[in-house]
Amino acid sequence: MPTKYEAGTFDVIVIGAGHAGSEAAHAAAKMGAKTLMLTINLDMIAFMPCNPSIGGPAKGIVVREIDALGGVMGKVIDKTHIQMRMLNTGKGPAVRALRAQADKVLYQQEMKRILEETENLTIHQGMVEELIIEDGEVTGVITQIGAIYRAKTVVVTTGTFLRGEIIIGDIKYSSGPNNQQPSIRLADNLKELGFDLVRFKTGTPPRVNNRTIDYDKTEIQPGDEVPRAFSFETTEFIMDQLPCWLTYTSPETHEIIEANLHLSPMYSGMIKGTGPRYCPSIEDKVVRFNDKPRHQIFLEPEGRNTREVYVQGLSTSLPEHVQTRLLKSIPGLENAEMMRAGYAIEYDSIVPTQLWPTLETKRIKGLYTAGQINGTSGYEEAAAQGLMAGMNAAANVLGKEELILSRSDAYIGVLIDDLVTKGTNEPYRLLTSRAEYRLLLRHDNADLRLLELAYKIGMVPQERYDKFNAKKALIENEIARLREIIIKPNEATQAVIRSAGGSELKDGIRGADLLKRPEMHYEMISSLIPADIEFTEEVKEQIEIQLKYEGYIEKALLQVEKLHKMENKKIPENIDYDAISGLATEARQKLKQVTPLSIAQASRISGVNPADISILLVYIEQGKIAKISG
């Protein structure tokens, strides 16, 4: 046993420096809390062990929300990407999302630079092995070498390191991602403290040398020529982009997999953990979708200064010699040189229904968890949780109100509510279909939804807030102008409408109503009734979306109003569910397990049906717990 010694006192300690840990540490320090971030390896801050990309459906909107709340992921990827594309441009604004290919090394370097320059933040290399708990509250941590750090709150963001094991073929060994040191003692400590842990699994594909790829047999996938950014504050854009490339598996690929399934740890029984449904291994895809003649494979550069190419779509834990054969069966990769083999990794995570919506654990006060330890997959989901946990840990210490985002506020609210209310039996991935109010939770309006909240809690400086208010005023004033001004059916007007393929006007029409026609766009309207100033593309887009989808948005807002009424019906913290007669046994068990804060949250628990909610409402409203709530 190492000699223990007092190493320092902080307000907030963050364990881990991945995507969750980086955001948590930055947020806590930014809010004014004296913060310490401890990581096993300082060279691996914000490392991307799997895909070299940020964003995508739902996830890209989360990155925008992180930026609106004062987080850093969006700013970092804007400075370090090699390609950026807006997805779903042919669909409505609710599902549009930005996706960027990252330069993995530059991304790490930029995040490390930002964190090192953040006031109130100390960064130290060290492995935490034990949490110090006194009277049900966390008071510090102990590292592998015996250093004792005291703190009022602790945020655990251990990713896939908790009792991590890498599996390739019939080989299994203790390891974190990319052959880093795993965290075993801390996993044991969490179990000793009474937390329910589950075993999950994720995987990664092989990487190949780009000099050995025959790109003539693949399809080029360029980035957008239009400047794009995740951060609302980005003003300089990277236009020198690198393409990705598309190819497909072949019948031979599928034959190799089927002939070697007995060597796959997934099918041999070696892997016990549950894998991510929406990111299956190539073995799983071939078995589950055996009617498909081929599967997409994207070749994604890992950076500007490396030969490594990520083979997206070929996640596997088959033996290395089988992986080599798989690669050579894919058009364009016949002579590909594998630089790193794909692998699966199993790890411990906690059952997330053990958390409050603030991400504080119910079992231990002052202890928060964020990222893959909570059962999620993905850098963006991790960063979002880290941001919220870091802000709330700091708020806890500083005597401020903690922030809980509702399902109608943000995708981040959907993510956290799903985790703490429903739990998850597989690595959770955020999807647009999970959000009931997705028309309100768009890529374009993340700042309009969240920046005011961020300013109030100290995550956004005055200068940014003033710029935001100026932008908001421009949008509101122009919408008001378009509602008032009449466009007459003169020749200029009819020519613009005809050019868009629309029906000519018979009478005058308000600018806002003309813009609501599906074929019309703001630029066309403003050419007929110019504004006094030239708006940015961002402002123009907002004006158009708010007016074009006004009817749908109003319907969604009415639904939100109903939700808020249910959210405002609070459930007393110490309610005795056993005392409520008429509740179904399953509902009683689930309510006791999740301990929902409101009727709305209770209604979303799996196994709690409308009849149970009615009984619960009557019980509360009849004043049977007046002495408790009073």
UniProtKB/Swiss-Prot annotation:
<dbReference type="InterPro" id="IPR044920">
    <property type="entry name" value="MnmG_C_subdom_sf"/>
</dbReference>
<feature type="binding site">
    <location>
        <position position="183"/>
    </location>
    <ligand>
        <name>FAD</name>
    </ligand>
</feature>
<keyword id="KW-0963">Cytoplasm</keyword>
<dbReference type="InterPro" id="IPR020595">
    <property type="entry name" value="MnmG-rel_CS"/>
</dbReference>
<feature type="binding site">
    <location>
        <begin position="275"/>
        <end position="289"/>
    </location>
    <ligand>
        <name>NAD(+)</name>
    </ligand>
</feature>
<feature type="binding site">
    <location>
        <position position="128"/>
    </location>
    <ligand>
        <name>FAD</name>
    </ligand>
</feature>
<feature type="binding site">
    <location>
        <begin position="16"/>
        <end position="21"/>
    </location>
    <ligand>
        <name>FAD</name>
    </ligand>
</feature>
<keyword id="KW-0819">tRNA processing</keyword>
<dbReference type="InterPro" id="IPR002218">
    <property type="entry name" value="MnmG-rel"/>
</dbReference>
<dbReference type="Pfam" id="PF21680">
    <property type="entry name" value="GIDA_C_1st"/>
</dbReference>
<protein>
    <recommendedName>
        <fullName>tRNA uridine 5-carboxymethylaminomethyl modification enzyme MnmG</fullName>
    </recommendedName>
</protein>
<dbReference type="GO" id="GO:0050660">
    <property type="term" value="F:flavin adenine dinucleotide binding"/>
</dbReference>
<dbReference type="InterPro" id="IPR049312">
    <property type="entry name" value="GIDA_C_N"/>
</dbReference>
<keyword id="KW-0274">FAD</keyword>
<keyword id="KW-0520">NAD</keyword>
<dbReference type="InterPro" id="IPR040131">
    <property type="entry name" value="MnmG_N"/>
</dbReference>
<keyword id="KW-0285">Flavoprotein</keyword>
<comment type="similarity">
    <text>Belongs to the MnmG family.</text>
</comment>
<comment type="function">
    <text>NAD-binding protein involved in the addition of a carboxymethylaminomethyl (cmnm) group at the wobble position (U34) of certain tRNAs, forming tRNA-cmnm(5)s(2)U34.</text>
</comment>
<dbReference type="GO" id="GO:0002098">
    <property type="term" value="P:tRNA wobble uridine modification"/>
</dbReference>
<dbReference type="Pfam" id="PF13932">
    <property type="entry name" value="SAM_GIDA_C"/>
</dbReference>
<dbReference type="GO" id="GO:0005829">
    <property type="term" value="C:cytosol"/>
</dbReference>
<comment type="subunit">
    <text>Homodimer. Heterotetramer of two MnmE and two MnmG subunits.</text>
</comment>
<dbReference type="GO" id="GO:0030488">
    <property type="term" value="P:tRNA methylation"/>
</dbReference>
<dbReference type="InterPro" id="IPR026904">
    <property type="entry name" value="MnmG_C"/>
</dbReference>
<dbReference type="InterPro" id="IPR004416">
    <property type="entry name" value="MnmG"/>
</dbReference>
<feature type="binding site">
    <location>
        <position position="372"/>
    </location>
    <ligand>
        <name>FAD</name>
    </ligand>
</feature>
<dbReference type="Pfam" id="PF01134">
    <property type="entry name" value="GIDA"/>
</dbReference>
<dbReference type="InterPro" id="IPR047001">
    <property type="entry name" value="MnmG_C_subdom"/>
</dbReference>
<dbReference type="InterPro" id="IPR036188">
    <property type="entry name" value="FAD/NAD-bd_sf"/>
</dbReference>
